[in-house]
């Protein structure tokens, strides 16, 4: 049986964005609380030497809340699983549990959990990937010697080690590592930058590149596309679709899960339920099973009601009483075998943004805007932009990382100012912005109820009204009075959307809003955007959301913005072809060095 979680936490680390010293202390406190607060038990049912893993009677609790109860973990070698479930159901905690072996996973199965960025050092991105590959070769060589000595040359585990060593040929390290890094958005120049000079997002890509290069037996990827632009997303999608070891992905992207996954694991109602096929197959199969389950439920309930009606009509006649007792035994046997349960639907919260008043167009106009962070001509990010935005604008900004998508949103809200030119805004324009570090505004020690109430103290609302406001965004019940720091990132994101709605904006600026949302919540967001009478500008790597809400695709690249002539599907196909060419060219260039 597995030990209590939290006893061996040296490897349990998470990445947080840069904050103040006080915020760091609070973040660390809640991080430690999360990592020490789960307990896991289970019994290994698969062979110790097998690359397949089956663990039965699995129970997982977090802060006393039961996330999994008497369920089975089953991971078959070579399968690619998508782990799905609503925000707060415990997907990331389950990953942590697997990664630190709180469940009895055989030691010969090496696990890589993408949870922290590469360490900042003097080594370049390329060298960092190769360093890990060389360490992996040494580890496998030591393992080879031990297995030969302990199990002999016919060992099952030994064959896998030979295969791994054959694939980790040092003569191919440079071109292979280069191809992966370029696929993840590096150029031949940026991959030669020292990791200490890279941002956290780029160091996370280095960490992902390391995992893809060494190909562990079990790879755990928690929202791997969160730090990627659309080009890197389509490359990773293609790459993982050919991953031939065991892979489990947590992702909010239906497109991504459809392209990559061979199986789906649904974490719901404290159970792990397994489905064959990709996400679309899961939706279809689940719907069919639920229809059949409800038919069986109604049929059984009708049968029980009929039997009970007969028993009630028997009265005191001895022969009828005997028949009644016989009929009661039928019900008793049904209950003993387990009655068919009614389908329990997961709660889906449909939120909305309030109506905004009319404003004369354009509500915002970029007049010959040029921008450079340094102010120097050599560092110009945008040149001579001339753009107009109205209340009916539905725009998706796409383009490579570093092209200036987030910068454009910062210019719009006035966080930064143009180097040249002017941005003219309607005098009554109100904007609400979601960005990738929006969670930093939250007071982790406060409760959602107290925090939202303090942010909008000028609003004359009583406690019940505030509860309803927060509840509309899926933060309900006890969650309203628990510390924000103990909540999942998905719940925190919903709280940010609540704050945005209370601003009553005319224009929504959404920079990667789906990063921590479950699929149902993303669909609710799409509905909220489509019913919102104001304008919307979106930066997202979620192709499905873009297809749901965007009327225009604006490409940010080469210091300007151009409108894409087609839809997001045609742009995705364009990116796929582009990324294939780039990775080939990068691998060839690395061979010539």
UniProtKB/Swiss-Prot annotation:
Residues 1-25 are annotated as: Disordered. ATP 1 binds at residues 85-92. GO terms for molecular function: ATP binding; ATP hydrolysis activity. It comes from the Eukaryota. ATP 2 binds at residues 399-406. Residues 1-10 have a biased composition (Basic residues). InterPro entries: AAA+_ATPase, ABC_tran_Xtn, ABC_transporter-like_ATP-bd, ABC_transporter-like_CS, ABCF_EF3_subfamily, P-loop_NTPase. PROSITE patterns: ABC_TRANSPORTER_1, ABC_TRANSPORTER_2. Keywords: ATP-binding, Nucleotide-binding, Repeat. Residues 53-294, 364-583 form the ABC transporter domain. GO terms for biological process: aggregation involved in sorocarp development; sorocarp morphogenesis. The keyword Metal-binding does not apply. SUPFAM superfamilies: P-loop containing nucleoside triphosphate hydrolases. Belongs to the ABC transporter superfamily. ABCF family. EF3 subfamily. This is ABC transporter F family member 2. It comes from Dictyostelium discoideum. The lineage of its organism: Eukaryota, Amoebozoa, Evosea, Eumycetozoa, Dictyostelia.
């Amino acid at each position: 049986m597995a030990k209590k979680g939290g006893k061996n936490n040296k490897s349990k680390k998470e990445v947080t964005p840069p904050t103040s010293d006080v915020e760091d202390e609070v973040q660390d406190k809640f991080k430690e609380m999360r990592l020490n607060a789960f307990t896991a038990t289970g019994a290994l049912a698969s062979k110790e030497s097998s690359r397949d893993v089956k663990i039965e009677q699995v129970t997982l609790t977090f802060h006393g809340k039961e996330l999994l109860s008497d369920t089975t973990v089953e991971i078959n070698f070579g399968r690619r699983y998508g782990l799905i479930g609503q925000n707060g159901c415990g997907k990331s905690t389950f990953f942590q549990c697997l990664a630190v072996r709180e469940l009895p996973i055989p030691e010969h199965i090496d696990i890589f959990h993408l949870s922290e960025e590469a360490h900042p050092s003097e080594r370049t991105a390329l060298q960092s990937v190769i360093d890990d590959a060389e360490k992996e070769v040494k580890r496998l060589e030591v393992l080879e010697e031990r297995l030969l000595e302990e199990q002999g040359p016919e060992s099952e585990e030994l064959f896998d080690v030979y295969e791994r060593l054959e694939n980790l040929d040092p003569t191919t390290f440079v071109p292979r590592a280069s191809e992966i890094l370029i696929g993840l958005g590096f150029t031949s120049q940026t991959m030669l930058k020292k990791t200490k000079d890279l941002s956290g997002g780029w160091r996370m890509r280095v960490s992902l590149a390391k995992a893809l290069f060494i190909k562990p037996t079990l790879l755990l990827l928690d929202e791997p596309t969160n730090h990627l632009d659309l080009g890197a997303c389509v490359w990773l999608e293609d790459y993982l679709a050919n991953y031939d070891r065991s892979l489990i992905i947590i992702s909010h992207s239906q497109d991504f899960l459809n392209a990559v996954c061979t199986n789906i694991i649904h974490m719901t109602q404290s159970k792990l339920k397994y489905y064959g096929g990709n996400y679309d197959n899961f939706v279809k199969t689940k719907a069919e099973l639920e229809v059949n389950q409800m038919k069986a439920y109604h049929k059984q309930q009708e049968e029980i009601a009929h039997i009970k009606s007969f028993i009630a009509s028997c009265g005191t006649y001895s022969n009828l009483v005997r028949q009644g007792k016989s009929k009661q035994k039928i019900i008793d046997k049904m209950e003993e075998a387990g009655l068919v349960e009614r389908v329990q639907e997961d709660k889906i919260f449909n939120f909305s943004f309030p109506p905004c008043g009319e404003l004369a167009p354009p509500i915002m106009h970029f007049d010959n805007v040029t921008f450079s962070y340094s102010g120097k001509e050599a560092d110009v990010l945008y040149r001579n932009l001339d753009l107009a935005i109205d209340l009916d604008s539905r725009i998706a900004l796409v383009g490579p990382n570093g092209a200036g998508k987030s910068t454009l949103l910062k210019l719009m809200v006035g966080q930064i100012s143009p180097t040249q030119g002017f941005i003219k805004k309607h005098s009554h324009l109100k904007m609400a912005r979601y960005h990738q570090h929006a969670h930093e505004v939250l007071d982790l020690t406060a409760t959602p109820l107290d925090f939202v109430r303090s942010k909008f103290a000028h609003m004359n609302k009583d406690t019940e009204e505030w509860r309803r406001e927060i509840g509309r965004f899926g933060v309900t019940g006890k969650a309203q009075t628990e510390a924000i720091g103990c909540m999942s990132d998905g719940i925190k994101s919903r709280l940010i959307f609540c704050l945005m709605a209370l601003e009553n904006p005319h224009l929504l600026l959404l920079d990667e809003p789906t990063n921590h949302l479950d699929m149902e919540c993303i669909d609710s967001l799409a509905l909220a955007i489509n019913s919102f009478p104001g304008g919307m500008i979106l930066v997202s790597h979620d192709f499905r959301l873009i297809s749901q809400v965007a009327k225009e695709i604006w490409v940010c690249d080469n210091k300007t913005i151009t409108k894409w002539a087609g839809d997001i599907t045609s742009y995705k196909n364009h990116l796929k072809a582009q990324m294939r060419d780039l990775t080939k060219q990068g691998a060839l260039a690395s061979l010539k060095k």
